[in-house]
């Protein structure tokens, strides 16, 4: 439980599982009103997904670390990584605006969702943190949250098991309607396990892609709902070697079907992109 306690302490101190300059999380936003009843909620996932690999290296030493504060100034996303994350979030924001969706953004006060506590099984810590975030949203008068990644979406929905969370949670996919492809040809989609198997979003983004002008390449073992592989990302804090092995296998499976591999999750991108060029949904459509 040392790791869970350390993560929870960091959430209380920094508002994130590990120390980070909050400007990294917020600098993507341009001309979005601050706050409001409906917000776009990033949980700083796209902005920091690449750092999960770095911080996972320190997990075995959690018992010896009283704090990760010393790492804050040493570890940050590369310019290439952060520029890409910002472009994706800006593309998502622009797609929503073009469809008449009105929303605000919490900027530096945006809290992290607590997803890592949930996914590592620290349910007591997650329950306590969920209450803190729920109270924060109530104080801000937030009634609807637009999510941009599956881990955050799942965490928010699980709040209801632990606290009086009554905010409407919707994925940005569900608000897009028709989209147009930015590219031509064939693509293969790597499904997020959460979106596909637990949250019922698989056909939402797949139908958008199908109607956008690209051709989805399918395989009954590689891309079907019940047979497709995980990217390996969620297990990285527990078993880094196994996580990377799974990612290599998955990348090989996907690129045999198409060179154009598309993901719908920043963590999937972070884990698979070591082994093949990966595109995000919001880089493929507009």
State where each predicted segment sits.
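Iron-sulfur-cluster electron-transfer modules
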Residues: 1-110, 118-147, 153, 159, ...
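Ferredoxin-type iron-sulfur electron-transfer modules in oxidoreductases and energy-metabolism complexes
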Residues: 1-11, 242-249, 281-286
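Short cysteine clusters
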Residues: 44, 113, 193, 231, ...
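Phosphate- and divalent-cation-binding pockets in alpha/beta enzyme and binding domains
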Residues: 112, 154-158, 270-274
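Helix N-cap/beta->alpha junction signal
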Residues: 148-150, 264-266
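Redox- and metal-dependent alpha/beta enzyme cores, enriched for Fe-S-associated oxidoreductases
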Residues: 183-241
């Amino acid at each position: 439980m040392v790791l869970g306690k350390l993560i929870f302490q960091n959430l209380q101190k920094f508002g994130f599982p590990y120390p980070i300059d909050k400007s990294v999380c917020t600098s993507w936003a341009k001309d979005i009103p601050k706050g409001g009843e409906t917000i776009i909620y990033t949980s700083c996932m796209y902005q920091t997904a690449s750092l999960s690999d770095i911080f996972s290296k320190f997990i075995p030493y959690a018992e010896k670390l009283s704090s990760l504060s010393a790492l804050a100034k040493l570890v940050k996303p590369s310019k290439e990584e952060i520029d890409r994350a910002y472009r994706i979030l800006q593309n998502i924001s622009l797609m929503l605006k073009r469809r008449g969706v009105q929303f605000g953004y919490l900027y530096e006060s945006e809290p992290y969702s607590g997803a890592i506590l949930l996914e590592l099984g620290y349910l007591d810590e997650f329950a306590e943190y969920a209450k803190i975030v729920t109270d924060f949203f109530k104080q801000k008068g937030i009634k609807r949250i637009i999510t941009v990644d599956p881990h955050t979406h799942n965490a928010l929905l699980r709040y209801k098991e632990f606290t009086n969370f009554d905010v409407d949670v919707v994925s940005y996919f569900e608000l897009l309607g028709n989209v147009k492809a930015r590219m031509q040809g064939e693509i293969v989609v790597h499904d997020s396990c959460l979106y596909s198997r637990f949250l019922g979003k698989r056909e939402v983004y797949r139908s958008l892609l199908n109607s956008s002008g690209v051709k989805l390449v399918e395989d009954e073992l590689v891309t079907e709902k019940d047979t497709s592989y995980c990217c390996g990302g969620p297990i990285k804090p527990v078993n880094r070697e196994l996580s990377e092995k799974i990612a290599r296998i998955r990348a090989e499976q996907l690129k045999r079907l198409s060179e154009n591999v598309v993901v719908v999750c920043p963590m999937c991108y972070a884990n698979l992109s070591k082994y093949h060029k990966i595109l995000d949904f919001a880089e493929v459509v507009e």
